[in-house]
Amino acid sequence: MSHNPIRPWRNIDRRKSRQIMVGNVPVGGDAPITVQTMTNTLTTDASATIKQVIAAAEAGADIVRVSVPDADSARAMHEICRESPVPIVADIHFHYKRGIEAAEAGAACLRINPGNIGDAARVKEVVKAARDHNCSIRIGVNAGSLEKHLLEKYGEPCPDAMVESGMDHIKLLEDNDFHEFKISMKASDIFMTAAAYQQLADQTDAPFHMGITEAGGFVGGTVKSAIGLGNLLWAGIGDTMRVSLSADPVEEVKIGFEILKSLGLRHRGVNIISCPSCARQGFDVIKTVEVLEQRLEHIKTPMSLSIIGCVVNGPGEALMTDVGFTGGGAGSGMVYLAGKQSHKMSNEQMVDHIVEQVEKRAEAIEAQAKAADQAAE
């Protein structure tokens, strides 16, 4: 539940779901909404895959999924799971034995696709492997790979077919007394995706893995995911998420956090508030923001920074941020600290100075949080 007593219009009541564990990461219940991505290297190239997993983890990924299409990939999972700093989800399609092998290799979770994993007997074997090796399971329903009998029944992929597929497989797992599972309802169509999740929310308390599948390239996929996932999250639906892009997995993680930050559901790093710039700007806003985004990537402390080109909105925005800079005249602007006007700074020195002030503010916030924790003990 995200409640703001001062600004109640920002409150989000999260759907009540049960909590499971993906490795050491809680998903569902009152746990933070986690951000995932998926590697796009050859899994058999363990070193390249591990390198990509580490890069994603450094960007903030809580969980990383790795495809296991064949026996050689399953063997590589031993090293990948051992070296990964975050829990690994094994992505399983068609070959149920790959799921068993991935569990044995150390995967924290097995993603199975109801449309191609096979019959109940095969699912039972996967469930046994998951239980034996302390794995959770994701039931990953996808509009593009629904079961044949559901396509015949409904005529085409649709929310009803997706929900029926998911509920059938929930029953399969529960019949095997297995409850450490989450479920996803993914389609490339945001309307279908949203409708499926909304219908499913009334039928199960399983945690939801969220995503708009095959969303597209960086720009189009970001917009699609922000609209589709943003609306569901705003409605309180969702426990873990992946932004699917035809792009670097690190970019998926960044966009995922930006969506959560925009809704006040999770905070990580510097939230930069900047204007689009116009003829009134007292400095090059666009270039400045580009540089600051790169130079402040190392800051993990949740905080806000306003970079506004002129005095129309600059002072007002700065009052609501930890650090702010508002363009003025004569090659300088005003620096704001903790919502208060502080001092002038030249445009030439502004970037270095802002980085320094953000770092100082981050240290102060961390120190305050540590002191509060110690006082509470």
Curated annotation (Swiss-Prot):
InterPro entries listed in its UniProt record: Dihydropteroate_synth-like_sf, IspG_bac, IspG_bac-typ, NO2/SO3_Rdtase_4Fe4S_sf
SUPFAM superfamilies xref list: Inosine monophosphate dehydrogenase (IMPDH) (SSF51412), Nitrite and sulphite reductase 4Fe-4S domain-like (SSF56014)
TM helices/strands, residue ranges: none
Keyword set, alphabetical order: 4Fe-4S, Iron, Iron-sulfur, Isoprene biosynthesis, Metal-binding, Oxidoreductase
Catalytic activity: (2E)-4-hydroxy-3-methylbut-2-enyl diphosphate + oxidized [flavodoxin] + H2O + 2 H(+) = 2-C-methyl-D-erythritol 2,4-cyclic diphosphate + reduced [flavodoxin]
GO biological process, one term: isopentenyl diphosphate biosynthetic process, methylerythritol 4-phosphate pathway
Single Gene Ontology MF annotation: iron ion binding
Broad EC category: oxidoreductase
CC cofactor: [4Fe-4S] cluster
One matching Pfam family: GcpE
Name of the protein in its database record: 4-hydroxy-3-methylbut-2-en-1-yl diphosphate synthase (flavodoxin)
Gene3D superfamilies for the chain: Dihydropteroate synthase-like, Sulfite Reductase Hemoprotein, domain 1
Recorded family membership: Belongs to the IspG family.
Pathways involved: Isoprenoid biosynthesis; isopentenyl diphosphate biosynthesis via DXP pathway; isopentenyl diphosphate from 1-deoxy-D-xylulose 5-phosphate: step 5/6
Binding annotation for [4Fe-4S] cluster: C275, C278, C310, E317
UniProt remark on cofactor binding: Binds 1 [4Fe-4S] cluster.
Known EC number: 1.17.7.3
